[in-house]
Curated annotation (Swiss-Prot):
Residues 21-70, 107-115 form a propeptide. PROSITE patterns: GASTRIN. The modification Sulfotyrosine is found at Y97, Y111, Y113. Expressed and secreted by discrete enteroendocrine cells that reside as single cells scattered among enterocytes in the mucosa of the small intestine. Released into the blood following ingestion of a meal. This is Cholecystokinin. The modification Phenylalanine amide is found at F103. The precursor is cleaved by proteases to produce a number of active cholecystokinins. The gene is Cck.
Length: 115
């Protein structure tokens, strides 16, 4: 999970660095073509001005990503639960069946020992 977060941080820093670099205007002879090329840049600048500080937006985005990662089911247990729910005749229900010795939940009085 830490590697995923680190990867997101690196990607966000690279994207912010690329957006912060000034763009060298191409030599366009047609004014209509030049306006068409500048329109996305103007929109991006307007969004950046209205959103506020880029670091605050990055922090909010990372916080939202971390919340989604924590809520998402992961690992082997989620796969096992899905497999058990598919077969209703499965004998093991909630990891408890006859003959299973769970030392943490049962006391010695529950069992009859031959003497």
């Amino acid at each position: 999970m830490k590697s995923g977060v680190c990867l997101c941080v690196v990607m966000a820093v690279l994207a912010a660095g690329a957006l912060a670099q000034p763009v060298v205007p191409a030599e366009a002879t047609d004014p209509v073509e030049q306006r068409a090329q500048e329109a996305p840049r103007r929109q991006l600048r307007a969004v950046l001005r209205t959103d506020g500080e880029p670091r605050a937006r990055l922090g909010a985005l990372l916080a939202r990503y971390i919340q989604q990662v924590r809520k998402a089911p992961s690992g082997r247990m989620s796969v096992l639960k899905n497999l058990q729910s598919l077969d209703p005749s499965h004998r093991i229900s909630d990891r408890d069946y006859m003959g299973w010795m769970d030392f943490g939940r049962r006391s010695a009085e529950d069992y009859e020992y031959p003497s």
